Amino acid sequence: MGNSLACFCCGGGAGGRGGRHVAPAALPSDPAYDEGLGHSFCYVRPDKFVVPFSADDLVADAKAAAAAEGEATTFRAISGAALSANVSTPLSTSVLLLMPEESSASATASSGFESSESFAAVPLQPVPRFSSGPISAPFSGGFMSGPLERGFQSGPLDAALLSGPLPGTATSGRMGGAVPALRRSLSHGGRRLRNFTRALLARTEKFQDSADLGSPDAAAAAVAACGGDPCGLQWAQGKAGEDRVHVVVSEERGWVFVGIYDGFNGPDATDFLVSNLYAAVHRELRGLLWDQREQNVQHDQRPDQPGSAPSTTASDNQDQWGRRRRTRRSRPPRGADDDQRRWKCEWEQERDCSNLKPPTQQRLRCNSENDHVAVLKALTRALHRTEEAYLDIADKMVGEFPELALMGSCVLAMLMKGEDMYIMNVGDSRAVLATMDSVDLEQISQGSFDGSVGDCPPCLSAVQLTSDHSTSVEEEVIRIRNEHPDDPSAISKDRVKGSLKVTRAFGAGFLKQPKWNDALLEMFRIDYVGSSPYISCNPSLFHHKLSTRDRFLILSSDGLYQYFTNEEAVAQVEMFIATTPEGDPAQHLVEEVLFRAANKAGMDFHELIEIPHGDRRRYHDDVSVIVISLEGRIWRSCV
């Protein structure tokens, strides 16, 4: 597993939900405790990569922001949480892949998580009803808190406690009975995330030459050249219902990749994205964001005209698609066949790091507007080629597995390199930046703060960096109707062909080509008029240069915004970190979604989470949230 486990108790007093985080509590000793609700995880940057910061610097830094726009601002910590509402469904191809003893566990796990050593993670565990811990009042709800509150820490977050690598075996005696069961359950829950790629590769060998799918050895070598896990690459990936989350961090190169994939109609498209999109992004960006000693890369993707944030770009469809071969770190022998079946990151390798170029020689090459556009175009190519590979392989299997034509996913991908942040999205997931307004600086410096949320002046503004692609956006509705003038039902029941709320998506072939619609059972077919696609996978793109005004970034699936506006989400994180600097802001947002959903339905927290998966989808969607702090200022952004 690699991730260190810790769990703390949080809850609300009888008077409300404020101050839910209290003293530590042990994990339940019951080895069968549920981890299907979701998970919380974090990554805190090692001290050597962090610029020292004190609370007194906030106002001075903010006032100097305009003069320091070119100053690099890097992330300090990553907080993530995911909550499942949908029932877990097996991969369509699982009958080809799973051994009998694996199929049951894989099909029923609604949540799973796996990571390298520098991430810490725990399952979301609700505080028991009427339990009394270190405080006298009973808890009214909430989760045992996430990994940002570690050990018996009572003060602000100490980064040294979470600087990697984290020991995977250092657990207290109170947790000894729970940890082995937790690891077993997480390993079973993660198996589905690697099934689809392996099945499709095996099934399509008889349809395609090996060149069509690329050389696995060449793909593995490319990953090794990027600085794999033994040389500092850290990763995390997990699932919650139909959502998938993927994080890759390279401290040596100074970049972080985050992917949030909000699937629909099944897990195959999202699992394919987890297995392949990062690999494609890395391949397309080679030579743009880093140099490599062994290969001279020609900059043949330069745009003709400069620009910093085009909305969509077309994909070059000439290059061949490559695939990664799974490799894994050494573990105690369990049999070669069994080892092959374990879920593991695509890029994690056993390799000799001595031939890698030193970090100081891996230079950031994006230094002009043209370079930023080239990076955005490279992200688009990576997405399009990933979808082409998915649809091409699924096309060979659609006769046997017609449901593959229904499956798709929204895509939100963020790449941060130094002070440059690149955002790509398809669908209705969002990236929201919390930034400080200069007009509020004088109020902040003159205001007082006595520890209560109500006395904290609103410091930050919410800036949405993505575009929503759904029928709720009038421009998208007009575009689809203009593209299908002969089809009055192109948009019906506030959905594309009465089926899909989003107007752009990865996969969902039945809305892109008539042949995939015809492959479906009659009850699932739409009335496909003409041959033009109803939806596309053309992303919206954005480049943003971070400044000292920027405090944190919220990346999330649309489940968060069922109960929050952008401004409310930023305000919730801002107030939470002001009152609980050692807390987990992503988990707090997920918790608030449940409280708001329960309140809307006229029930309490525990009544809601006791509703089975699937039925609970009527009250809230799957929710995946990642909060990235910038220069550590998230922890003192409103002092």
UniProtKB/Swiss-Prot annotation:
Subcellular location: Cell membrane
Record note on disruption phenotype: Enhanced resistance to Xanthomonas oryzae pv. oryzae (Xoo), expression of defense-related genes and cell death (necrotic lesions).
Residues of the PPM-type phosphatase domain: 227-630
Annotated region described as Disordered, given as residue ranges: 295-341
Keywords from the named record: Cell membrane, Hydrolase, Magnesium, Manganese, Membrane, Metal-binding, Plant defense, Protein phosphatase
Any single Pfam family the record assigns to this protein: PP2C
Enzyme class: hydrolase
Gene3D superfamilies: PPM-type phosphatase domain (3.60.40.10)
Cellular component terms per the entry's GO annotation: plasma membrane
Cofactor(s) recorded in Swiss-Prot or TrEMBL: Mg(2+); Mn(2+)
Keyword field contains Magnesium: yes
Binding site for Mn(2+) 1: D262, G263
One GO-annotated biological process of the protein: defense response
Subunit structure of this chain's protein: Interacts with XA21 (via juxtamembrane and kinase domains).
Name used for this protein in its record: Protein phosphatase 2C 35
